[in-house]
Amino acid sequence: PGSDRYSRAADDLGKWMNEGVLTQDEKPAIYYYTQTYTEKDGSKHTRKGFIGLSRLVDFGKGIHPHERTLSGPKADRLQLMQACDANMSCIFTLYSDPALRVNKLLEGAIAGKAPDIDVTDDDGIVNKIWRVDDKQTLSGVIESMSDKSLFIADGHHRYETALNYRNMMREKAGNFTGEEPFNFIMMYFSNMDDEGMTIWPTHRVVHSLKSFDADSFLASCKEYFDLKEFA
């Protein structure tokens, strides 16, 4: 066993692969992933998307961020990536496809097939995944996504870390083709135009601000927001 959490993570990953807990599919594939969840009003929604590889590009060249990042989390994720030589979780991206072409292609490919994974998590969300590996569907999805802009919904630190890792590996390799694994990253792609896509608020707690007056701040907020006191 390693002496720190990064080497221990690499040891665990290697053990899972050796024991067959994690296996590599024989054929190239993408993975259609749906999540069915219930809102507080009782309404049910199903978010649809797929997991696949995306080529790493600098921001503004087809992939766009919406938040700034911190150096600490990026350093942590880089150490994990260097130790494991793997993507440990998907970057969550949104794309626009009002015609739902990609979803229709994937739903056609899985019609009548049981999911490869069907599990309800601790939050009551029903997660289902189907492996899609027929060449016609894969080609259709790739073609449909070729001109799409991607917007990172979650994973800014991991994406920037992957860019840094790619650059380090390119410098180390000297010569590279651009098709090496380090030029790509695992992503979850979801259509922002699908009815299953909903946006919930994110609650942040801010503390230790100097000269902060809550009453004055709330009074200023009333000019731009509708405020509701909960506690």
Summary of predicted features, one role per range:
Residues 1-231:
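Surface-exposed, charge/polar-rich loops and edge strands
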